[in-house]
């Protein structure tokens, strides 16, 4: 059986670049598949905005994200990448989050380096945890995997607050996670 993580890895291998389209619900996911997209993305803002009419300010829970994820993965075979924000708690909670995402047939997640009471990554005035705490989050996520093909990305929101050098320094610390994502680079050249 090909796991969702393997599907995601294959999509990355086959598509340069892989365009991962946002889908806030099962219907959007089906439309994305019909349009020929190869992978889907559910953002934290997507869950907060589309499911609850709320801003992306750490208001939603693991259960909210897991439920929306299940609805999407039950409607399509496309691999789904999920924004798990800061992981919904400390190390044990992050490990549980990963298990829940795998159980929901999610292919991949990204975990960010903001404080638990986070803001949308595209908004100003973000506060970040230190590099050691984020490295511990990544380790907890990796340790929580029950499927080695499950894809974990580390995301840094440090560009706006620490500049390019700070973002690169953080990425070097987070390299263990397989893939890095900086959400607030000013342009394509910086990212």
Task: List where the protein language model places each region.
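N-terminal amphipathic alpha-helix/helix-capping segment at the start of soluble metabolic enzymes
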Residues: 1-22, 31-33, 142
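Alpha/beta enzyme core
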Residues: 5, 26-55, 60-75, 86, ...
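Single conserved hydrophobic/aromatic residue that forms the stacking wall/gate
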Residues: 181-191
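A generic structural micro-environment signature
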Residues: 14, 18, 53, 94, ...
């Amino acid at each position: 059986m090909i796991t969702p993580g393997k599907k995601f890895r294959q999509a990355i291998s086959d598509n340069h670049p892989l365009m991962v389209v946002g889908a806030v619900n099962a219907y959007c996911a089906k439309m994305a598949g019909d349009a020929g997209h190869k992978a889907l993305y559910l953002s934290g803002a997507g869950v907060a905005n589309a499911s609850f009419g709320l801003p992306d300010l750490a208001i939603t829970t693991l259960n909210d994200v897991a439920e929306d994820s299940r609805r999407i993965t039950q409607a399509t075979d496309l691999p789904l990448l999920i924004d798990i924000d800061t992981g919904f708690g400390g190390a044990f909670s992050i490990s549980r989050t990963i298990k829940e995402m795998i159980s929901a047939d999610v292919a991949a997640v990204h975990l960010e380096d903001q404080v638990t009471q986070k803001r949308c990554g595209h908004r100003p005035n973000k506060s970040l945890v230190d590099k050691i705490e984020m490295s511990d989050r990544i380790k907890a996520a990796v340790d929580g995997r029950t499927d080695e093909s499950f894809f974990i990305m580390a995301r840094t929101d440090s560009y706006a607050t620490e500049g390019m050098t700070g973002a690169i320094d953080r990425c070097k610390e987070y390299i263990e996670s397989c893939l890095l994502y900086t959400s607030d680079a000013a342009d394509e050249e910086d990212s």
